[in-house]
UniProtKB/Swiss-Prot annotation:
The active site is at D383, D436. Keywords: Endosome, Glycoprotein, Hydrolase, Membrane, Signal, Transmembrane, Transmembrane helix. Residues 215-246, 298-317, 365-373, 449-460, 507-545 are cytoplasmic. Its EC number is 3.4.23.-. This is Signal peptide peptidase-like 4. Residues 26-193, 268-276, 339-343, 395-427, 482-485 are lumenal. The PAL motif is required for normal active site conformation. The gene is SPPL4. It comes from Oryza sativa subsp. japonica.
Length: 545
């Protein structure tokens, strides 16, 4: 409760940036280049819907994964055949089935022999397809051995996770069961990605204007203090920068190192209880961010309450407006945490996340382009390493595993913005890590602060073009995401070159790069030179520093 502390903002920045580099399309079975492709065993891995009917009445639907071998599975529901389902005897189908199949689909258990042998036995018995029940609750990719060069399997094979397979097997006790197998194609672009793009760009836009407005108010206050006399200006640094954190070169480098350690900790300790801990941390940050945003908005209409303070134990002086808003924020976060597995819980998560990002960008600042370049360049390498290169050591992408929450029963860690894919037959979410918004947002907020301080127009400044560059980079990220069959992409791989490159190129073209690089603020002629003890101080920046 109370004004957001710089220490908390810095800590939240670290937690959010640990998930800097992921934009993903949610749950999907991807192509696997490590699985061998040989003649007769070269299918792409696809998700398969298994629609069921019991006694000619439509029942549940299950989702499995198609095999590398066999014919491709029909993509159109209206073209898929509806056939009967039989439980294999023997149930593992490692020996030829004893019953007459006659075009039905065989349901078998995994184990005791190869997938290809089960499929061959089922085909020889006259089955039209085979559904294999896995012995664990996850999906598994059915592949072939490299020495199986004479495969000629002509029926599709689908693997179901253990729980889905057992439920399907129980349906057989209720009567005659028939199934329909098909694998609908995903849309090339889903509207969720468009809305996620708008959310990311809009968040940076709002945060940048708030940051620039706060900086301008600080300058106005600074000038008032200077007019009051030289003694007041001696306390300027403490008063003018209260509640703000300026990142320096050392912290920019250490930031990425510590974020890497934190990401490894998330990867190694990822479990149900650890996700619960992250939810608590996210709720604390979300309450702080939502409260800060609401107080800033409402203070214009409830100015007396915003300017009247009361001392609260452990929190110090707190405004009456903050006391009034805080319970609402706490209740909002608690309700989201309790019901976060509900269908529409993503709305609450996004509201808390956006408020948190906006607050951190308003508090944490990049002082100049040099620090911003180091921070974003390190984040760029961090992103690429943990999304792509980490596979060499961990045999999976650490960043994507953590972001999706693969080792838990959750839909992912809460430090993400997410929107459900509305027109995707497979459902799921489009997601983007907080760091993909926050880190470029720090640079873009710096651009707007500089533009306002230099009294630049929108077209002659840096903010507009940085925003365009960020939006373009994020758009390219989603193009790459779709071209790569939904594989999670390191968003900063595309965003950083666009955003930082545009900023540096414009600064160099306009001859302002040196000033942007070192000072981070324009030259300002000081109107209070008579108050300075030394004639060598020739501008207002010297006064404020």
């Amino acid at each position: 409760m109370g004004t957001s502390s710089p220490e908390m903002a810095a800590a939240l920045l670290l937690v959010m940036a640990a998930l800097a580099g992921v934009a993903a399309g949610g749950d999907i079975v991807h192509q696997d280049d490590e699985a061998p492709k040989i003649p007769g065993c070269s299918n792409d891995f696809v998700l398969v819907k298994v629609q069921t009917w019991v006694n000619n009445r439509e029942d549940g639907e299950f989702v499995g994964v198609g095999a590398r071998f066999g014919p491709t599975i029909e993509s159109k529901e209206k073209h898929a055949n509806r056939t009967g389902l039989l439980l294999a005897d023997p149930i593992d189908c490692c020996d030829p089935p004893t019953q007459k199949v006659a075009g039905d689909v065989l349901l078998v258990q995994r184990g005791n022999c190869k997938f290809t042998k089960k499929a061959k036995n089922a085909e020889a018995a006259g089955a039209s397809a085979i559904i294999i029940i896995n012995h664990v609750h996850e999906l598994y990719k059915m592949v072939c051995d490299r020495n199986e060069t004479d495969l000629d399997i002509n029926i599709p094979a689908v693997l179901l996770p253990k729980d889905a397979g057992n439920d399907l097997q129980k349906l057989l006790t209720r009567g005659k069961v028939s199934v329909q197998l098909y694998s609908p194609d995903r849309p090339l672009v889903d509207t969720a990605e468009v809305f996620l793009w708008l959310m990311a760009v809009g968040t940076i836009l709002c945060a940048s204007y708030w940051s620039a407005w706060s900086a301008r108010e600080a300058v106005i206050e600074q000038e008032k203090l200077l007019k009051d006399g030289h003694e007041s200006s001696l306390n300027l640094e403490a008063g003018g920068s209260s509640g703000m954190v300026d990142i320096n070169m050392t912290s920019a480098i250490l930031f990425v190192v510590i974020a890497s350690c934190f990401l490894i900790m998330l990867y190694k300790l990822m479990s149900h209880w650890f996700v619960e801990l992250l939810v608590v941390i996210f709720c604390i940050g979300g309450v702080e961010g939502l409260q800060t945003c609401l107080v800033a908005l409402l203070s214009r209409w409830f100015k007396p309450a915003a300017e009247s303070f009361v001392k609260v134990p452990f929190f110090g002086a707190v405004s009456y407006l903050t006391i009034a808003v805080c319970p609402f924020c706490i209740v909002f976060a608690v309700i989201w945490a309790v019901y976060r597995r509900m269908t529409y819980a993503w709305i609450g998560q996004d509201i808390l996340g956006i408020a948190l990002i906006v607050t951190v960008i308003q508090i944490v600042r990049i002082p100049n382009l040099k620090v911003g370049s180091v921070l974003l360049s390190c984040s760029f390498l961090y992103d690429i390493f943990w999304v792509f290169i980490s596979k060499m050591w961990f045999h999976e992408s650490v960043m994507i595993v953590v972001a999706r929450g693969d080792k838990t029963d959750e839909d992912g860690v809460p430090m993400l913005l997410k929107i459900p894919r509305m027109f995707d037959p497979w459902g799921g979410f489009s997601i983007i890590g907080f760091g993909d918004i926050l880190l470029p947002g720090l640079l873009i907020a710096f651009a707007l602060r500089y533009d306002w301080a230099a009294k630049k127009t929108l077209q002659s400044g840096y903010f507009l073009w940085s925003m365009v560059a960020y939006g373009s980079g994020l758009m390219i990220t989603y193009v790459a995401l779709n071209l790569m069959d939904g594989h999670g992409q390191p968003a900063l791989l595309y965003i950083v070159p666009f955003t930082l490159g545009t900023f540096i190129a414009l600064g160099r073209k306009r001859g302002e790069l040196r000033n942007l690089w070192t000072r981070g603020q324009p030259e300002r002629v000081c109107t209070h030179m008579h108050m300075q003890p030394s004639p060598k101080d020739t501008n207002c920046d010297a006064v404020s520093s």
